[in-house]
Amino acid sequence: MEGQSSRGSRRPGTRAGLGSLPMPQGVAQTGAPSKVDSSFQLPAKKNAALGPSEPRLALAPVGPRAAMSASSEGPRLALASPRPILAPLCTPEGQKTATAHRSSSLAPTSVGQLVMSASAGPKPPPATTGSVLAPTSLGLVMPASAGPRSPPVTLGPNLAPTSRDQKQEPPASVGPKPTLAASGLSLALASEEQPPELPSTPSPVPSPVLSPTQEQALAPASTASGAASVGQTSARKRDAPAPRPLPASEGHLQPPAQTSGPTGSPPCIQTSPDPRLSPSFRARPEALHSSPEDPVLPRPPQTLPLDVGQGPSEPGTHSPGLLSPTFRPGAPSGQTVPPPLPKPPRSPSRSPSHSPNRSPCVPPAPDMALPRLGTQSTGPGRCLSPNLQAQEAPAPVTTSSSTSTLSSSPWSAQPTWKSDPGFRITVVTWNVGTAMPPDDVTSLLHLGGGDDSDGADMIAIGLQEVNSMLNKRLKDALFTDQWSELFMDALGPFNFVLVSSVRMQGVILLLFAKYYHLPFLRDVQTDCTRTGLGGYWGNKGGVSVRLAAFGHMLCFLNCHLPAHMDKAEQRKDNFQTILSLQQFQGPGAQGILDHDLVFWFGDLNFRIESYDLHFVKFAIDSDQLHQLWEKDQLNMAKNTWPILKGFQEGPLNFAPTFKFDVGTNKYDTSAKKRKPAWTDRILWKVKAPGGGPSPSGRKSHRLQVTQHSYRSHMEYTVSDHKPVAAQFLLQFAFRDDMPLVRLEVADEWVRPEQAVVRYRMETVFARSSWDWIGLYRVGFRHCKDYVAYVWAKHEDVDGNTYQVTFSEESLPKGHGDFILGYYSHNHSILIGITEPFQISLPSSELASSSTDSSGTSSEGEDDSTLELLAPKSRSPSPGKSKRHRSRSPGLARFPGLALRPSSRERRGASRSPSPQSRRLSRVAPDRSSNGSSRGSSEEGPSGLPGPWAFPPAVPRSLGLLPALRLETVDPGGGGSWGPDREALAPNSLSPSPQGHRGLEEGGLGP
């Protein structure tokens, strides 16, 4: 029966079991554009059943603009346009009903007119294979088209699908279009009186050229009911454009699959989420050209808790951004010592914005073509090392499983990667062989100028076989080791700050980063695993540092594995032990392989098998290194050891780095004549996309890594190993660049009362009562290298703004550039930092005299003390830190050293950023009956007693060492190592005056 219904007063969603057929609201018989009401998306009732004579309203998208790939569990078709047209349905037996007559009312200008046709055939089969989506409470049917449809003509913003909870918005302008089939809906009525039967074969339609992935995605549509095919076929025969071949880089939009309800009812009508509203949406590479209105452009970011899962957001809420721009200060000059630090350009992440959850975004340039799928872009050739050829640079490694599956992936971040400035990481490994550090390491760290002097944002340095003898370990426990001091001195002028360090005997790992990246490096943790002597000795094993950089979990693992040719299986077991034992706390990645990116490097001690010494040297001399690759144990193990699955390494285009004669570039000429081998290696692994969501709730395939150089440095000859360095470029699909704390300070302090700091904290920040704000000089070396500090108060001053003031006594005198930083006890790093500002305060006589005395004492130090104790480090303890220099980022300087028994009852409650520098109340030694002091109890100039003196047998008793406590004596109290010579003989720490004099002149004194 054909005809037009004039009743449309009832709203959709009410049952149409009796009376006239209800018309969807907004569908009229005038020429005005029709409007599809959002109530079409109401969820279906689970137990509703249609009457035997109840007609069903079928909606089928027609035209190339409505073509979408069907998911594996059932299609969810978005309404392509609010322009419905009439199309009859066919019965399952293949009998077609009469096609609706085309009249003047169905002209393209009269968009809202409908022609309703009823069919007395049997009802279509249930949606068991995803062919029909029919809410039983509405009687709506949206069958998929039988057979593949034409590809989309364009992918503009008007095709942005909407989520279930959002209403559809009509397009900005609806004008006449050449055909109705291009953007219309096919509506038909089907009675449901007969049991379902298999549908008939649909009419043949020209099929576009599809990729294998798209054909598999469209396979369920081939079993759709014939009722949908007639409506679209009749429309296509009239005015559908001819299909064109579909390029490999273009694909249908893939809405996520949705299963049926628990009672077996078909799923409700569900469209793809709106990219402007859904947090799970990611930019797609289908669009060939970007426009300011294109939904694939990046959006402002929003920091989410680490345990937030994916899901559609509520209306009005912010969506997490894909990317926000980050600044990169000007590159330092090519000089070894760069000029003074200029103020870095203002960054959206460091400047106040209108909303704390948003920062402005920079869309891609209009003339920048988006990359096609299946192509990989190599990094800039300028970053290649001198001894590598451009054609040998490795291709970028992405987290996607393969490039062929990217076309069907529901998310791709390639357009975002294209606009990401990148984050450069340099990794260095060096077995120093207990040697003293060289004078200069700028070439090793790529800091001596050139194209890549400004390329590093983070530097990881792994050392092995650092001198760990007992006397060296005692000095290193009190002061920073020489190697750490060397790298801090070299990197400090280039704005690098020590983020974290960990040491296990001779294995050390140092992690540096530019100071302006510190607010975006969080959750810093370290761990170590011993594997020497069955796990009881730390000469072999691994140390690691993990952190979150811009919301991405990174882990750096420095290992020293067993040596010798026949210990390959033992090296494998040790590596497995390290991976299994090292665990981290917190909601982030717990195991090493759970991180988004893992760097594994160190002296892995893999050797070259089969070939003898003469052939190996011949291959090296004749530059035939490829013959040695095949017999390298690590290369062979990559194919056989499951533990190495996913680890990648750049080409070994440099000569083996072991073993050399110390001081030369000649391989071992000793009696052992060790065979050269690539023992020092750098590998990386990106978390597989199938590893589940990341700790932040986003998908794991969101990181791209490119290795720009992988080389050895033959110019360093202090060890029998050559150092190896690699440079990487990381491109993030999104950046969490919202600082947790924002500091506000005046541009210049010329009076002490101007030393006021105001700061604001985000609601997600977990603050601690041990947080503090430090004042640093420009070029500071680590987070505890401050000039002054003040505890962070948490009393609300103005809304969410807090304020602290530095005391006049703690402020530095004179003129200089300084930086303020908020140190988080929970994150173990500066999470808020300011731009450089100036302090110009008049110097006082007290400050000048203190400086003169400090300089005099420094001149009295011997050469060994100056070599061990570098003078540029600041004390991590706030007490008296402005007057004295410390030698370690973990311990304070010792103007006077007191050894006394440790007592829990006598521990003071002094709060300090460094727990090692807590000071105890001074207790004078017992006095004899005649009032004279015994031993070293002579009082100093200020009346305070001197340090204790123990009998000669005390230093020889090692059992007493754990009960001793190292403590800082008040420098103003005159506590010195030199008591009266007369009282030294019976109770001196050393059995002879010469021994005491040596201790006074040694490395522990000022």
From Swiss-Prot:
- What segments bear the compositional bias annotation Pro residues? 196-209, 337-347
**Which top EC class is given?**
hydrolase
Keyword field contains Lipoprotein = no
State the residue spans of region: Catalytic: 425-728
* Pfam families to which the protein is assigned, alphabetical: Exo_endo_phos2 (PF22669), SKICH (PF17751)
Question: What catalytic activity is recorded?
Answer: 1D-myo-inositol 1,4,5-trisphosphate + H2O = 1D-myo-inositol 1,4-bisphosphate + phosphate; 1D-myo-inositol 1,3,4,5-tetrakisphosphate + H2O = 1D-myo-inositol 1,3,4-trisphosphate + phosphate; a 1,2-diacyl-sn-glycero-3-phospho-(1D-myo-inositol-4,5-bisphosphate) + H2O = a 1,2-diacyl-sn-glycero-3-phospho-(1D-myo-inositol 4-phosphate) + phosphate
E.C. no:
3.1.3.36, 3.1.3.56
Q: Which UniProt keywords apply?
A: Cytoplasm, Hydrolase, Methylation, Phosphoprotein, Repeat, SH3-binding
Task: Cite the residue spans of the region called Disordered.
Answer: 1-416, 844-1006
Cellular component GO terms held in the UniProt record? cytoplasm; cytosol; dendritic shaft; growth cone; neuron projection; plasma membrane; ruffle
Subcellular localization(s) per the UniProt record:
Cytoplasm
Q: Coordinates of motif RSXSXX motif 2 in the sequence? A: 350-355
Q: Does the keyword Repeat apply?
A: yes
* Annotated signal sequence range: none
Q: Which residues carry this modification: Phosphoserine?
A: 291, 324, 903, 990
Q: Which portions of the sequence form the region Required for ruffle localization?
A: 729-840
Function, in words: Inositol 5-phosphatase, which converts inositol 1,4,5-trisphosphate to inositol 1,4-bisphosphate. Also converts phosphatidylinositol 4,5-bisphosphate to phosphatidylinositol 4-phosphate and inositol 1,3,4,5-tetrakisphosphate to inositol 1,3,4-trisphosphate in vitro. May be involved in modulation of the function of inositol and phosphatidylinositol polyphosphate-binding proteins that are present at membranes ruffles.
What's the domain remark here? The 5 Arg-Ser-Xaa-Ser-Xaa-Xaa (RSXSXX) motifs may constitute binding sites for the 14-3-3 protein.
Record-given protein name: Phosphatidylinositol 4,5-bisphosphate 5-phosphatase A
What would be the name of the gene that encodes this protein?
A: INPP5J
